[in-house]
Every structure is written in C-alpha cells, then in structure tokens.
Amino acid sequence: MSNRVFIIAEAGVNHNGDIILAKKLIDVAAKAGADAVKFQTFKAQNLVSKNAQKASYQKETTDKNESQFEMIKKLELDENTHKELIAYCKQKNITFLSTPFDSDSIKLLDELGLSTFKIPSGEITNLPYLRQIGGLNKKIILSTGMANLGEVEAAIETLVKSGTKHENISLLHANTQYPTPMEDVNLKAMITLKNAFGLEVGYSDHTLGIEVDIAAVAMGAKIIEKHFTLDKSLPGPDHKASLEPDELAAMVRGIRNIELALGDGLKHFSKSESENIKIARKSIVAKCDIKKGEIFSEQNICVKRPGDGINPMRWDEIIGQISQKEYKQDDLI
C-alpha cells in the first residue's frame, strides 16, 4: 500500500444476490472515490451448518424464522457472477476484492487472479484456512475483531510459515458487533497492533456514521473498510448498519482531507501562511521621535506590527546601542 489511505467500500452481501444491485454498488463506490469495492465469496454448505443460528442483529433485519444457512444461501455469488463483477470493476477503474469464507472460495479467488486477500475476523483462528491463504504468498489484509494479541500473533506466524512475506500483511483493528457501540470501538488498540507487530494497520468499521473512520486515519490508519448500501431500508442482514451513497462519499472526502491535513510532520511555516509573517508578527519600532546619537532604551523603542523589521527577540541586543540616524515615531528601527 502507498502513503495514501486505501479505502475499501464493503458491499459485502448488500447486493442481496442480485448482480444488477451488485453493479449499482460498484457504481456508488467508484463515484465516491473508494479505492476498492469488496464482496464476500462463499458456499453456504461449506460455511455454516443447517442448524446454525443467526446473530441478534441479523434476526432484527431478516426473516426471524429462517436459519443462518437459509439466509446466506440466498446471498451466494457464483463463478460467472464473480467474473462479470471483476470485469465491471476494471471498467469503472476500481479494485475488486472479496473475502473468501471456505477452501473452495479461496481457490476460486486465486484462479480469478486476485492479488490481495482479505481475511475476516471470524477466520483468524481457522488454522487450515490460514495455511491455505498463506501458501498463496499474496498481499493479505487481516481483520482482528474478537481477537487478543496472542491470537493475532499466532495467525501472523501461520501465514508467514505457510509462505506469505511478513511485510505483505496488513492488520485491521475491528469490532464485529453491528453496529459497534462507541464505547467498544477502542481505536487505541490499532496503535497497539502497530507497535506489537510492526505492520501496516487500519480499521474495519461497523459503527454508525463516519467520524470513527476519520479519527482512525488521523491516528495513522492506512486502510479503512466500511460497509455501504444503496438504501438502509432494503431487506438483508447488513443494510441497516451500512452507509448510504452520500454518506460514503462524505467519508471518502473526509479521509482525503485528513490525508492532506496530516502533512509531513516537520514544523515550519506553510506556503499559505508565509505572507502572514510580516502582518501578524512584530518588529522593534521607534516609540517616539529619536535623534541621531541617542541611546536606544525602553523609553524610546517598543514592539509593534509589521514584522518585516528587526526581530523583537533581539531586544536585549538593541537596548543600549546608539542610534545611527534619526527616526520618526513608529519608524522601523
């Protein structure tokens, strides 16, 4: 990744299994200025058992009587759909990403030529999964929701031992609750990850709004991932906790502004304020008329604007010197 923040617009399963909706999501992400749009790749039978229950937030936004398997089955994207979406992303000049949730999906995304793999928080303790992705030697973005430092370390070690270069791993601090309560965000943990592992870090956000994403960038995040939708009122598990198009665009603008605002870290006057030095700073001036030969003292000199004369930091040096010319009141010394 470059110094520019890599913004991932997370479409996830907000396409509701509809390729037309998926393409509209790509349009929105590209128009907003995101760097990538991310989907999810899975086969329901490989991901959950038929008796698996849905999360509480999923029960609130989907049919309460259907199982997690039934919900997810409707959201699968087949191989041809993946190919069509990848081609559409190229047309829109935005990177296609997808999170694989099972072995077959890892193979599919590798065959489709993805150079970056996103590992979700739920797979951070899945040893066979980590070994399979690690063996591909791709760039990896690893979400760390629900994990402690020991689990993150074990996942990194597995990826590296399997063939991934350490420097090709980026870590995303995350909280997997949709939406995440503000008191549970713990953005400082992102810095802990950076200090502990020396890797590029970012934030995968599930809070409502955009302020936490902008704060994360100000704290050093190099990757931001955020769910978005065409309409929060659409049926499906994640729409309600996602940004709508105008909110996504506002987040991207905010992040790009913070990128500029962070600067180079050197303390100096900026180009835009250079002309203000003469206007806002002060110089040593004549407090009253001064004749040639008089001695400068606190009685006949003072400090006033403008700032293009003798710097007042030289006050002690000037006091006691002999005036070499005549000065009128307010003349620069």
Model-identified regions with their sequence ranges:
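Catalytic cores and adjacent flexible loops of soluble metabolic enzymes
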Residues: 1-333
